[in-house]
Amino acid sequence: MDVTIVIPTKNAGRLFEKVLKKVFAQETTYEYEVICVDSGSSDNTIEIIKKFPCKLYEIPASEFGHGKTRNYGASKGTGEYIVFITQDAMPASSKWLQNFIDAMKSDPEIVGGFGIHYPYPDCNVIDKMDLYYHFKNFGDDNTIFQITDENRQRYKEEEGYRHLLSFFSDNNSCIRRDIFEKYPYKDVSFAEDQIWAKQMIELGYKKLYSRFAPVY
């Protein structure tokens, strides 16, 4: 298996069916599986999941954790790459997965990456602009971030630069399984993705920003 896509869910709502349709409509040469980990939905989320060839795992709401639930979902798959999206992150391209994995495979030192987020069409103007400028900071192409001798001092001294190099988002991310099994997410209440990326950057690994693997 090339890719395991993990989606934590709880009361995902009507949009989730559209998300799964886009996930399963990917035009890709990579073999992929989709794992949903539901933590106590009381709406029709389970019924929606069962319409698709997903692997479903249900856990009590009390057992949910942003880090540990994603770790659990990843452990149930076999893909060489683990892709995390949220229940409202809809692939904005039929080449989303192909572009993401191609970019990850372009450099053997890349251990994780995140893709651009587009605003939904009905998003308010302020949020649209906020998203635009946030991701504009990462570049207009696929961009690789790494601490080197040239930027190490800047990383230590500038908070904004540290954030740039360590930013990561599980709304739309991809991690090599061999690395994730060695360095899983921390069991924390939030920011498990940012903590992980900071650790990887400071260990000397490379992080990818993919301009061509978009989700809404």
For each predicted feature, which ranges?
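Conserved donor NDP-sugar-binding/catalytic core segment of glycosyltransferases
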Residues: M90, S94-D140
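A recurrent flexible, glycine/aromatic-enriched loop bordering the glycosyltransferase active site
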Residues: F145-I175
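A conserved acidic beta->alpha catalytic loop
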Residues: D38-I46, A89-M90
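Glycine-rich, basic loop-to-helix element that forms the pyrophosphate-binding segment
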Residues: P60-G77, Q87, K95, N99
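Catalytic beta-strand/loop signature of glycosyltransferases that borders the donor
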Residues: L208-P214
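Acidic donor-binding loop at a coil-to-helix junction in glycosyltransferase catalytic cores
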Residues: F190-W196
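Short aromatic/hydrophobic "clamp" motif used to bind/position activated sugar donors
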Residues: I82
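Short, acidic, metal-binding catalytic loop of nucleotide-sugar glycosyltransferases
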Residues: K21-E31
